[in-house]
């Protein structure tokens, strides 16, 4: 075969024909149909892998070869009229690189003169690759079949023209003929040769209207892209318009799409022309939208620049006219600001600062951004209530009445507030600690701040700190930033209009640490009485006196509050309400409030005590009253709807009507009488109040290992480990055979795995559960416990006792085991809340086991 001619044979033929640079006859026709293609039989052809291009049937492309091996392949195929299989590489670092593609796009019908082909020259020579020279016959062919570096579907092409350049490189003009797929590689040296099968393009029926419309749409949008993209020669639109072959139009447009190579390969691999046309049209639409967006952005940018220039020239003209007329409107504004400053009762330092900034404003062009910032700064200084205070009302009896009217229960909290106001009345300053109301949601922490403001006859302001993670929100931004503004503290003082409001810092436990600083640290200056007399705001750039402000903070959790910040506050616990308290709150506050908000009168709907209790027990699960208020609101809206529609309705709400309006009741939180060894009832605290929790344990054959499940935290895992180690160390005291630890594993589980559980208060509960499992003895019914344990077997006190007791009452618990150190917490609780409960105060685990396990 001529493909195996040597290089010398090529050179002899070159000399015989007397050529070194081909300028011979015209090209062969660019689109030439091959009727001799047989799709049912295989054929053997040589392969050429290229990168960054996918060749489609009928499309013409140029390729420049720099390797002698590639040049020989091109010459051999050209003189024997043999076809070449063009395959695309997936990765640029593949070892099968044979030729380098020239990116220049060729015209469909004609080629430029060859004196411009120098663009393809000057390609750096590649390092010689000896991998393929050392391949012995076909022993490495399987590597080609297994590689993922090339696509196995490509296009068979013929060489239309071969051009030898003066520098020795060779450029060929290829035209795609038909798609093919590799069946098997049969030769590696000197060129890749494979057995292939042709892939036929399945054309739709001639009367397929959808296909015809699709072709017209492709042509139309392709022309639009050419017209809107200044980088594409306008003559290309005429070429697109004159294409008659539908398949050639699809392939030509697909080849020229500005998309990734893998997407072009997907288009090539479609067997159905209609599907290829659909996907090509989709990519065309994406490209068209990108071009439109790009052009639109460029237009807007040019328009904005023109507008700015126009406004600048107009402003200069206006300024010149004003100078001629002697009328400067902004100078009048400056004078108005100066007159206002004379009326302010501020310090000499503040007056000097104002005068300096006012002088800057006078020298600044009103069209400059700095003018707006300076104006905002001066407005802030004038709007702040410098040394302006509201007159306090220290009538403590009046304050007590307001607190009792607005809040039912929480007597200890109200007593502490009265003490706070008493000190304020006698001493005249606020050097006492900042009050922080701590408790579950819905117990009235925020509303207490409003009541204090009302009692003292002071202004009330509130800022929510939840999610705040930027220090500038507290201290403000520096004036050098565009859009700078003061911090939320000074903004609230400005809004209050006095320098001594009651300032509620809501959700102080939910401040976060962000990349812009730590707002908790900035809050230290706000709350520290030694520092807030000269509170420095970055925007104000001078100190402002906050010492007369009554700051009140609220929090649901103390664990997330900065320790230094926590040290500056006095924590006042606001525990949850009992059922009786919730009923009274509903009658005195929630129901009248909802009737007023929904435009009803007290006679329009009647809710009895039993009905309110039903709502509390079956439709709420909280320490506060927020969810209770929502359910009462639903019932009030039921009445409002019927009144508005002139329908008859039941004014006195009964139990069945509650279920009709609120839906099926929730399962009440009641104690489950589970007489099974290893199951113990504990008491837990959550941010919404107290709950009962079951601890389960069981023995499994094993080697004495401990495991715990139920979405528990590290502290709870440590408590389980301490309990297990204590039992192993004191097994004879509890009557447990030592061999049991060698034969069995113990598994502890805390039900409701979707809820995270942590803390030390389940220590005695887990220890009791493990001993119950080893002894196979049941726990006394209606008994619950809470407490921390140590390795010495001591029972330590825990927190949240009131919430836990309320949860025990709701669950119908009769007896509770607590640490002796928690007895003081029981003494602080009203006797009415303890009715029906029996308490056992213990100091050691032996006492817990004696009280809990049935003998």
UniProtKB/Swiss-Prot annotation:
InterPro entries: AAA+_ATPase, ATPase_AAA_core, Lon_bac, Lon_bac/euk-typ, Lon_lid, Lon_proteolytic, Lon_Prtase, Lon_prtase_N. Coiled coil: none annotated. GO terms for cellular component: cytoplasm. The active site is at 761, 804. Residues 674-855 form the Lon proteolytic domain. GO terms for biological process: cellular response to heat; protein quality control for misfolded or incompletely synthesized proteins. HAMAP family: lon_bact (MF_01973). Belongs to the peptidase S16 family. Homohexamer. Organized in a ring with a central cavity. This is Lon protease.
């Amino acid at each position: 075969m001529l493909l195996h001619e040597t290089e010398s044979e090529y050179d002899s033929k070159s000399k015989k024909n007397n050529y070194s640079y081909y300028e011979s006859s015209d090209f062969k026709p660019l689109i030439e149909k091959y009727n001799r293609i047989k799709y049912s039989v295989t054929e053997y052809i040589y392969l050429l892998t290229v990168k960054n291009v996918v060749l489609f049937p009928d499309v013409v492309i140029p390729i420049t070869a720099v390797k002698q091996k590639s040049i020989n392949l091109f010459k051999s195929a050209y003189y024997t009229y043999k076809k070449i299989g063009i395959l695309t590489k997936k990765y640029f670092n593949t070892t099968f690189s044979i030729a380098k593609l020239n990116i220049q796009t060729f015209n469909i019908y004609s080629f430029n003169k060859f004196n411009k082909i120098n663009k393809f020259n000057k390609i750096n020579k590649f390092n010689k690759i000896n991998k393929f020279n050392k391949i012995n016959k076909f022993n490495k062919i399987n590597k080609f079949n297994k590689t993922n570096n090339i696509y196995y579907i490509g296009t068979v092409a013929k060489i239309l023209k071969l051009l030898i350049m003066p520098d020795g490189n060779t450029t060929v003009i290829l035209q795609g003929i038909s798609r093919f797929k590799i069946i098997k590689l049969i030769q590696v040296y000197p060129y890749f040769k494979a057995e292939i099968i042709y892939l036929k393009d399945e054309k739709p029926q001639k009367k397929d209207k959808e296909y015809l419309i699709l072709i017209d749409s492709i042509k139309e949008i392709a022309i639009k892209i050419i017209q809107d993209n200044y980088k594409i020669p306008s003559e290309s639109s005429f070429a697109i318009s004159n294409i008659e072959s539908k398949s050639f139009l699809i392939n030509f447009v697909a080849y020229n799409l500005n998309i990734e190579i893998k997407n072009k390969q997907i288009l090539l691999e479609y067997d159905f022309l209609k599907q290829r046309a659909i996907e090509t049209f989709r990519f065309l639409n994406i490209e068209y939208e990108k071009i439109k967006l790009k052009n639109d952005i460029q237009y807007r940018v040019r328009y904005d620049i023109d507008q700015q220039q126009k406004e600048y020239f107009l402003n200069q003209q206006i300024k010149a006219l004003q100078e001629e007329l002697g009328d400067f409107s902004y100078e009048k504004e400056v004078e108005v600001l100066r007159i206002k400053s004379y009326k302010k009762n501020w310090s000499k330092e503040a007056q000097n600062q104002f005068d300096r900034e006012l002088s800057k404003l006078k020298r600044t062009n009103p069209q400059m951004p700095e003018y707006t910032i300076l104006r905002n700064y001066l407005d802030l200084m004038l709007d702040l209530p410098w040394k302006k205070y509201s007159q306090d009302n220290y009538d403590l009896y009046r304050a007590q009445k307001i607190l009792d009217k607005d809040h039912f229960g929480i007597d200890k909290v109200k007593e502490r507030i009265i003490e706070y106001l008493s000190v304020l009345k006698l001493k005249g300053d606020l050097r006492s600690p900042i009050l922080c109301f701590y408790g579950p949601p819905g117990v009235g922490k925020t509303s207490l701040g409003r009541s204090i403001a009302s009692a003292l006859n002071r202004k009330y302001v509130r800022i929510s700190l939840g999610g705040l993670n930027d220090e500038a929100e507290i201290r403000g931004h520096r004036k050098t930033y565009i859009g700078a503004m003061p911090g939320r503290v000074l903004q609230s003082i400005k809004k209050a209009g006095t320098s001594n409001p009651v300032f509620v810092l809501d959700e102080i436990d939910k401040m976060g640490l962000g990349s812009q600083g730590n707002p908790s640290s900035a809050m230290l200056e706000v709350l520290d009485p030694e520092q807030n007399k000269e509170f420095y705001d970055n925007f104000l750039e001078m100190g402002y006196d906050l010492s007369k402000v009554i700051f009140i903070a609220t929090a649901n959790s103390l664990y997330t509050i900065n320790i230094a910040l926590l040290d500056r506050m006095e924590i006042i616990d606001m525990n949850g309400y009992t059922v009786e308290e919730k009923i009274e709150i509903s009658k005195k506050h929630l129901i009248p409030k909802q009737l007023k908000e929904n435009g009803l009168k007290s006679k329009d709907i009647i809710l009895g005590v039993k009905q309110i209790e039903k709502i509390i027990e079956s439709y709420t699960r909280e320490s506060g009253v927020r969810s209770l208020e929502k359910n009462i609101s639903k019932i009030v809206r039921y009445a409002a709807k019927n009144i508005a529609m002139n329908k008859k309705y039941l004014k006195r709400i009964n139990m069945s009507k509650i279920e009709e309006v609120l839906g099926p009741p929730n399962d009440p939180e009641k104690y489950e009488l589970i007489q099974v060894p290893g199951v113990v009832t504990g008491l837990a605290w959550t941010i919404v109040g107290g709950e009962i929790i079951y601890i389960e344990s069981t023995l499994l054959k094993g080697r004495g290992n401990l495991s715990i499940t139920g979405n528990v935290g590290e502290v709870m895992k440590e408590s389980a480990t301490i309990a297990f180690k204590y039992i192993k160390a004191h097994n004879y005291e509890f009557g447990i055979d030592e061999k049991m630890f060698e034969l069995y594993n113990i598994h502890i589980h805390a039900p409701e795995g979707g809820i995270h559980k942590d803390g030390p208060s389940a220590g005695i509960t887990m220890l009791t559960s493990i001993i119950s499992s080893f002894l196979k003895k049941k726990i006394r019914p209606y008994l619950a416990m809470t407490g921390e344990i140590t390795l010495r077997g001591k029972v330590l006190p825990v927190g949240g006792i009131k919430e836990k007791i309320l949860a025990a009452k709701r669950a119908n618990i009769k007896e509770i085991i607590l640490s002796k150190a928690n007895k003081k917490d029981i003494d602080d609780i009203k006797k009415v809340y303890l009715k029906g409960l029996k308490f056992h105060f213990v100091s050691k685990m032996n006492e817990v086991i004696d009280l809990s396990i049935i003998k």
